[in-house]
Amino acid sequence: MTDKVNMAEIIERLEQLEAHNAIRNCLNRYMEICDELNANTDLDELMNLFDQDCIWEGIGEKYAKSFGRYDSWQSIYDMFKSYTQNESHFVMNAHFVNSEQIYVNQNDANASWLMLQTSTFKDGRSHLNTAKLNVKFQKQADGTWKIKHFQTQNIFSRPVSHWHSEAELPLPSQE
């Protein structure tokens, strides 16, 4: 018995896998850069993750009020620039994303993640946030995938006392 190989179908499946991987890498690089926002951050690298015709917005009651909406590449750049002053807004910032869903349709894609963000600010306060991310991506002429429309919606947000403790880790007895 001989199986007929449909090369067009195999190529389409391979392109889907490559698109998923590129989209995932784009969002993860975005988070890595946001974890280290300070006066030395290369905003050009961050903004290279965005399509030239892009939108970044907070949605829902809390994040629409806190973040607002930025309707151009330059306005998004300026928003991130405000986080990169000499005295950084964040002393510690770590983003964790999970529950990923990516749907690719040829040259565009819709994706979503749950995001957990742990932060300590320059004033010493610490915060725990969880948000739903809905992100549209656009395939570029060179084949790369970039953020077209980034939306973040708060699920919960709360202050915490601190993140790091010198207390010993509780471990099971080795006896």
Outline where the language-model segments fall.
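A structural signal for alpha-helical segments
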Residues: E18, T41, G68-D71, R125
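Short beta-strand segments enriched in hydrophobic/aromatic residues
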Residues: C34, F50-D51, G58, M115-Q117, ...
